Amino acid sequence: MTDETASQEASQSTDAAAPARGFRKVREGLVVSDKMTKTVVVAVEDRVQHPLYGKTIRRTKKVKAHDESGTTGVGDRVLLMETRPLSATKRWRIVQVLEKAK
């Protein structure tokens, strides 16, 4: 019995010692530029409510995203995920292409 409890305690201590990873942000956006190698510029839209008037406002932010395969083009709707810094301004990567441009 003592061997079982010792192994259970050891497994629990290693789980507790490992730092918990944070939740990665996922966004959907539209590719607006693909002129860089392995990098695309994606316009990400965010809808926020005005603090005083309550009207819903669309805010757009352009982010640079890593495109390893280079298959995305201008006008494609893509799914982005936050990642470690890949360059001075690139902190997102493309997870999948949701819709190709027509």
UniProtKB/Swiss-Prot annotation:
Intrachain S-S bonds: none
Keyword terms, alphabetized: Ribonucleoprotein, Ribosomal protein, RNA-binding, rRNA-binding
Keyword rRNA-binding: yes
GO molecular function: rRNA binding; structural constituent of ribosome
Positions of the UniProt region annotated as Disordered: 1-20
Function noted in UniProt: One of the primary rRNA binding proteins, it binds specifically to the 5'-end of 16S ribosomal RNA.
Record's protein name: Small ribosomal subunit protein uS17
Organism field: Frankia casuarinae (strain DSM 45818 / CECT 9043 / HFP020203 / CcI3)
Gene encoding the protein: rpsQ
